[in-house]
Amino acid sequence: MVNLTHMRIACSTVKSQLNLLSITATLIAATLSATALGAEVTATILSPRALQEIAQVETEIDRIEAQAIERLAALPGNQIQQIELLGKLMLYDKQLSVNRNEACAFCHTPETGFTGPVSELNRTTASYPGSVRTRFSNRKPQSHAYAPLSPVLHYNPGQHDLVGGNFWDMRATGRRLGNPAAEQAEGPPTNPVEMGLPDIACAVYRASQRPYRALFENIWGQQAFALAWPRDVELVCARPGPPPAGAPMPVQLSPLDRGRASVTFDQMAQSIAGYEASAEVTQFTSKYDAVLSGKSQFTTQEKAGYELFRGKAQCNACHRDGGPGEDPLFTDFTASNIGTPANPRLPYYAEKQPDSLGYVANPAGSSFVDRGVGDFLTEAHLLSQPSPVDQRWVKLAPDNQARIQVPTLRNVDKRPYPSFVKAYMHNGYFTSLKSIVHFYNTRDVLPRCQPHDVGEGTTCWPAPESSENMNKSRVGRLGLSDAEEDAIVSFVQTLTDGFMPAN
């Protein structure tokens, strides 16, 4: 058996790999007015360009999975490395989704810093389809690199902030398993808009059929998959979630086997999180790291940007570059509302009607507002969470409405080629680093955009999705010149892993 106390374990906001053949007929995305969420929502098939990119990503995921499977023939002797391999195998395994068509890795590939790998989706829908192709999340994929280093969610009374957890809304607290990243890994498999399984037991059953079963049992014990599966398990696990209201655990297991399935599911998540914490993912190999170690130097523009980052622009207040005894993670793991506009490109706004399976992802339709951490802290939500929470946090909900976890800036510019589009912020509203810095600089300087204003992002900004608890002290009126904005972007680009210092 394994003790993970001293491991840095992590997992991503995982979603999924797509099956191109089924997408061409069924995958829809919302197209909305660029300035009015109240406008009529229509549906459209994904573009040929998006489908082509998806096929390329699928091919790469299959290649990586095949290489990982080959490593089963010559296992590393180190048990931590075995756990990392097991986690990688599950992360790239599309069989762990309801329609056997999505791997967690579909939204988290190395070439993009372990976030969304489809440029056309980042440019258009921002969020990614689930195993049920017509279902999209309300948020863009987070990077799972460096997520292992987030602490268990706790309240810091000195700064009046919640700190830690995983997910944009911090709901993977880490209070049950001792690690937020492992608990985060347990979310997507049974999320109806992600991997879509109706029961955690389905994930365990599917894993028991995979080539890595022997490795799993070697690490976690022979009892891991020693369950008496019902005859209809294949049929039950092929029905997309959510499960019927009267049968929240549709796989019929004995109490003993249900407990065993829960333990094994935890171990699956811990293994995935172990891979996310490995040096393959959480690397610290950027130019910034090389400068810290004396192996490289900033350019004049990068150095100026770093000074602005730590000074006039106040970026370092939340995206901390570390202090005594701290790793430079470029996040403080708190939450903030910077006033990001709603992203009308999200297909989630169109998911108000029952789909072909009767599921309604977004009853609020175009009136949906993402209230982030505040929604997580409501009493009803807290009581529904599998991870223990402090009920005293309910009173913190008003002060956390619309606040979103501060992401790391590491790898924000990592991309497979220069023209590749990345989506930024929790809803993917921004698609360039320059636009983000300009927003921080001018949010409260430029006027509000009028409907169909062609100057959006240049001469005006849309209203925030929610103005509750909006950060007004460090965002909105920074007084930066255009050249200073460019310098900050130049510095942030030094945070991309994979830098090779000149000899």
Q: What are these model-derived regions, one by one?
A:
Residues 37-503:
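Periplasmic c-type cytochrome electron-transfer domains
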